Structures are given as C-alpha cells and as structure tokens.
Amino acid sequence: NGAYTSFLGPQPLYLLVVVFLTSLGTWGLPQMVGKFYAIKSESSIQKGTIISTLFAIVVAGGCYFLGGFGRLFATPEQVAANGFDSIIPSMLSGLPDILIAIVLVLVLSASMSTLSSLVLTSSSTLTLDFIAPLKKKNMTEKSKLSVMRIFIAFFIAVSAVIAIVQAKSKVTFIAQLMGISWGALAGAFLAPFLYGLYWKKASKASVVASFVFGVGIMIVQLMISLGFITVSGGFLGLIFKNSLYSGVFAMLGSLVIVPVVSLLSKKTVPVNTDAMFSCYDRTVEVHATTALSDKKN
C-alpha cells in the first residue's frame, strides 16, 4: 500500500495534520510566550534561531527515522494487540541499562519542564488577571503568592488524575491526547497572539470568540473520544476523525474567526491601541553588541 516505498507514506493528509499540529500549534502555547520574555537582546535571538533550528532538525529527523525503523521491532500482530504506543518501549528494551536510564531522564526532564511552565503560566494568569481584579481590596504580594501556590498544587493534582484516568480508559494513543491539549490551547491563543502583535484592529470580542471556538471544538472531540457523542461521515466526520484533525481545525478556524469578528465588532477594540503600537515607532539607541547585526565595519 505504499507504506515502505512512498516518502510521505500511505496517509499524506494525516502526516500533514501532524506537521501542522506540532509546528503551528507551538506558536499558540501560552507557556512559550514566557520564554520570549527572557530574551536579553536581539543578538540572543540570532543565536537562539541557529540553536533551535539545529535542535528541531535533530528532533524531527530522529522522529522520522524512529517511525521508519519502528517496523523492525514490532510485527503488525503486536501493534494490533498492543497499539502503536508499544513500539518505542519495544525498541528501548533492547538498549543497555545506561542508555535506558539516559532516555528516561531526558523524557522526565522534558515532561517536568513543560508541566512547570504550564502550571506557572496558568496559576499566575488566574491570580493576577482574573482573581486580583475581582477583589475590592488590593491583594498583597504575599496573598497573591499563596493563591498561586494553591493553583499550582491543584493543577498538578488534576494532571495526575488525568494521567490515571487515561491509563484506565480506551483513549491510550499519546498523539491524540496531545491533540486535545494542544488543540484547545493553540486553538484559543494562536490567533489572538498573532493578530494582537501585528494588527491594531483585533478586538476583545474576537479574542472571546477564539477562546470559545477553540476550547469548544476540543471539548466536543473529548466527548467523542470518551464515547459520549458519535459523529460519522461528511465534513464533521473528517474534522472529528480524531483529536489531531480537530486540533488543526481549531487552530486554522481561529485564524479566520479573529479577523472576521474583529471587523464586525470594531467597538470592542481597546481605545489605547495606538498608544500600545507606538512603541514600534520610537527610535532606540543601543550599543553595537546588542544590535541585531553584530558585524563591525
């Protein structure tokens, strides 16, 4: 069926969906914004671009070859019985103990760094942008810190519960779980982040619409994955085929919804938008070592 002879495999559309979800979806993850706050100068951007590109090549190339050579470690019968997620453990079982330990440490470090950035971003957003404005009295820094710690513990507990429930449910495909989480986050945040940075006409109503659309699509997908709702055939059948398809649809749909709703709700555009964008018009003098180009005449 072309699985071993075609460069794109027997399902090129599915491959395209995975590429969209893992590349375009990264733009819309809220925790990624925090990483840009740590940029020291424009010269750091230049170095980071080279390092991240090389890292992306290693990761993408490694994943591609893992998929290509995975068939050597698992037969179709084993995959049918244990699922695709059993291929990587089968490959690791043949490695020496020291290499298995290194792989486990790398996986745990990546998982913990993602979890920490997510819970920190979520707890600070809820505390500073939602709870603090609702308080009649100004919250002290100590009380804000206490509330953030409570949210951090709560989100970690929720993550543990989800992991336990997932281990005992029929939704065991890791990529589909990633599709639900990334689809909800990127579907909600991607368009507001992108248009908010470069387009003055982005409105508050469009941001709300993007949030409702992205999260709503993935909630429906979650209900379908858990078996509470059934969808088959036609356009809806394609969108909700699995969480990867619906995640990409949520992201691409939000890119259309935000400009359309913004043009229909011009009254909800913040009044100080011009003042916000004026920072791009001001002249800034910096040392040559911090400029984008470090070339000396």
Question: What is the role of each PLM region?
Answer:
Residues 1-297:
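Membrane-embedded helix-loop-helix hairpins and adjacent transmembrane boundary segments
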